[in-house]
Regions:
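Transmembrane-helix motifs of polytopic, lipid-linked glycan transferases
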Residues: 55-79, 114-116, 120
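Short acidic/glycine- and proline-prone juxtamembrane loop motifs at membrane-interface regions
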Residues: 97, 102-110, 285-286
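Membrane-interface alpha helices of multi-pass inner-membrane proteins
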Residues: 100, 132-159
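Membrane-interface transmembrane helices that cradle and orient dolichyl/undecaprenyl
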Residues: 117-132, 304
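Signature aromatic-anchored transmembrane alpha helix within multi-pass, membrane-resident enzymes
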Residues: 130, 182-187, 307-334
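Membrane-lumen/periplasm interface segments of specific transmembrane helices
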Residues: 159-253
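Hydrophobic, aromatic-rich transmembrane alpha-helices
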Residues: 238-260, 265, 269-276, 298
Length: 335
C-alpha cells in the first residue's frame, strides 16, 4: 500500500512502462518487487475512489476477496451437486489460512481471478460456448497481473489436459480447444497492454526473480536445502489449510484415484507436488497459496458428504475451528 503514492506521482502509463526499470523498480517496497504491478494498481484505483487510508483499503480488500465464495460454490455445484457446494462453503469459511490472511495481506484479493478462472474452466468443459474460454484467458491475464502464482492454474490446466488424454480422450479434445482459445485471449491481453503502455511482462518477471533470489536464494544451492525447503513448502501449506481438512482432502483424493479417477482432485495432487518441489517458492506458502482453497475444500466436502456421517462432519469442523483459534492466538501474540 505504501507504493500507491509513487504510482499517483508518476501516473499509470509511466508506472507500467518503466515498472522493471531502476527509476520505478528500485523505489518499490520489497514485497512489490516480487510481484507484478497489478496489486499496486488495484489499491491505487480504490484510493482514488475512497481516499488514501488503511481502513477503507482493508475493507475493500476483504469485500473483494469475499466474492470468491460465489465461484467456489458454483464450481463445487458444477462438479458434484448443490449439497457438496453448500458444504464446501462451510469448510471454506473456517479454513485457517484464508481466515487469517485475508484481512492482513493482499493474497486474498490475488486469489479472486485464479479461483474464478478455475470455475470457468470446468464450466466450459460441459459447454460449447467459446465466450467462456475467452473469459478464462482474461481471468488468467488479470490474475497474472496481480500475482505470478497464477502460473499454478495454467500448470493445473495443462496437467488436467494430459490426464484427460490418458483417461478421457473425448473430453481431451474439448479441453484442448478451450485452452487454445484461452491462450489466444491471454496473449491478446498482454499484447494490447504492451501496445498501449509498453509494459513488458518478461522484464517484470525477470526483475522479480532476481530480487527474490537475492533475498532468499535459489532454493537449490544444495540437495539438503532443496529437499528441506520443498518438503517444508508442502507441509506448511497443508498444515495452514487445517489438519482436519487436509486429512479429509487426502482421503477423498485417494478414494477418487482408486475409483473413477476423478480428474479434478488427481490433477491438483500432481500439480501441487510439482509446484512444491519447483523451488519457485521459499516458504510463506500457507499465505501465498490461499488461492488453492477450492482444490482442498471441494474434495474434502465431497468425501464427507459421501460418508454421510454427521459425527465425522462435526469433528472435522470443530477441530478446524480449534486450529483456527490457536493459529490466531499464536499469530497475534507469539509470532
Amino acid at each position: 500500500y505504501g507504493d500507491v503514492p509513487l504510482l499517483n506521482k508518476v501516473g499509470l502509463y509511466y508506472f507500467l512502462r518503466n515498472y522493471a526499470k531502476a527509476d520505478i523498480f528500485l523505489e518499490l517496497s520489497g514485497h512489490s518487487q516480487t510481484h507484478p504491478p497489478g496489486g499496486v494498481i488495484f489499491l491505487w484505483v480504490f484510493s482514488k475512489i475512497f481516499g488514501y487510508n488503511l481502513i477503507s483499503t482493508s475493507l475493500i480488500s476483504i469485500l473483494f476477496t469475499s466474492t470468491v465464495i460465489i465461484p467456489i460454490y458454483l464450481l463445487a455445484k458444477t462438479l458434484y451437486g448443490k449439497e457438496v457446494g453448500r458444504l464446501s462453503i462451510i469448510l471454506f469459511l473456517i479454513m485457517p489460512n484464508f481466515v487469517i490472511f485475508t484481512s492482513t495481506s493482499m493474497d486474498g484479493p490475488f486469489s479472486v481471478f485464479p479461483i474464478l478462472s478455475t470455475y470457468l474452466f470446468f464450466k466450459s468443459v460441459s459447454s460449447t460456448k467459446k465466450v467462456l474460454a475467452i473469459c478464462i484467458g482474461l481471468c488468467l491475464s488479470l490474475g497474472m497481473l496481480m500475482t505470478y502464482s497464477t502460473v499454478f492454474i495454467g500448470l493445473y490446466f495443462t496437467i488436467f489436459a494430459v490426464l484427460s488424454f490418458v483417461f478421457d480422450r473425448q473430453q481431451f479434445h474439448h479441453v484442448i480447444k478451450t485452452l487454445s482459445i484461452s491462450l489466444i485471449s491471454f496473449v491478446a491481453f498482454y499484447g494490447l497492454l504492451f501496445l498501449f503502455t509498453d509494459f513488458n511482462p518478461f522484464e517484470a518477471v525477470w526483475a522479480s526473480i532476481k530480487k527474490d533470489e537475492a533475498g532468499m536464494g535459489t532454493g537449490y544451492e544444495t540437495i539438503g536445502r532443496y529437499l528441506s525447503l520443498s518438503t517444508a513448502n508442502l507441509l506448511a501449506f497443508l498444515i495452514g489449510v487445517g489438519a482436519p481438512l487436509t486429512i479429509s482432502w487426502l482421503y477423498g483424493t485417494l478414494k477418487s484415484i482408486r475409483g473413477t479417477w476423478d480428474l479434478f482432485p488427481s490433477s491438483y495432487l500432481v500439480t501441487l507436488v510439482i509446484i512444491a518441489f519447483s523451488t519457485l517458492y521459499t516458504m510463506e506458502v500457507e499465505r501465498i497459496w490461499i488461492f488453492m482453497a477450492p482444490f482442498i475444500v471441494i474434495p474434502a466436502a465431497k468425501y464427507l458428504h459421501e460418508r454421510n456421517n454427521l459425527a465425522d462432519l462435526r469433528c472435522v469442523i470443530s477441530l478446524t475451528v480449534l486450529q483456527l483459534l490457536l493459529f490466531e492466538v499464536m499469530l497475534y501474540t507469539y509470532w
